[in-house]
Design a protein with these regions (language model features):
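Acidic/glycine-rich C-terminal interaction modules and beta/coil loop segments
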Residues: 109-112, 118-161, 165-168
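Residues that act as N-cap/strand-start positions at coil-to-secondary-structure junctions
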Residues: 36, 78-80, 86, 119-122
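Protein maturation boundaries and topogenic segments
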Residues: 1-79, 127, 150-169
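Mid-length scaffold segments of soluble, non-membrane domains
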Residues: 76-108
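Surface loops and adjacent helix of pleckstrin homology
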Residues: 47, 61, 97, 104, ...
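Structural motif
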Residues: 41, 51-56, 90-91, 98, 132, 138, ...
Length: 169
């Protein structure tokens, strides 16, 4: 290998390393260890227009991120996987423990988590605003999602996720 090729390779590797530090690229794959969606490996893709039922990776914003971390649900910096259940213009209600979207019951909230700790509560109906999403894993009764923290900014979504390999019972 010539000196010029060696120098070019060294510069290329160095530039790639610096780019990963400076640009903080998003991960291409996410390992999900939560039972809210099937445990396994998911591929992260850029978000397009959101669709109801689409599975997305979300970086919890503050103060939610701190709440999740302090209570041992999810460390800061770890994305959570949730399904889009309502888009801007749709009406989401929590009446007692029942969650509904556009007058269709989609699931139940709980008063307490698996350790007996009280969960956040909200009540009433609200229209999802521009730049917001209602995220809820309706297939999992134990999912910590919009049942408790209501709407999230769409900007918190870091990508769509597609299963690569999952462990389903």
């Amino acid at each position: 290998m010539s000196r010029l090729m060696m120098l070019a390779a060294t510069i290329g590797v160095g530039a790639a390393l610096i780019a990963t530090i400076v640009l903080e690229p998003l991960p291409l794959y996410i390992w999900n260890a939560s039972a809210s969606v099937p445990i396994g490996l998911y591929r992260l893709q850029p978000p397009d227009q959101f669709q109801v039922t689409e599975l997305v990776a979300v970086q919890p914003p503050e103060p939610l991120a701190t709440f999740l971390d302090l209570n041992g649900y999810l460390p800061i910096g770890v994305p959570m996987l949730k399904r889009v259940l309502a888009l801007p213009g749709q009406t989401v209600c929590r009446t007692g423990l029942t969650i509904s979207v556009d007058d269709v019951a989609v699931g139940e909230a709980r008063d307490r988590d698996g350790r007996g700790r009280p969960l956040p509560k909200w009540q009433g109906c609200r229209v999802v605003g521009d730049g917001e999403l209602f995220l809820m894993n309706w297939q999992s009764d134990d999912s910590l999602d919009g049942r408790y923290f209501e709407f999230l900014p769409a900007s918190a979504v870091i990508g769509r996720v597609l299963p690569v390999w999952t462990w389903e019972e």
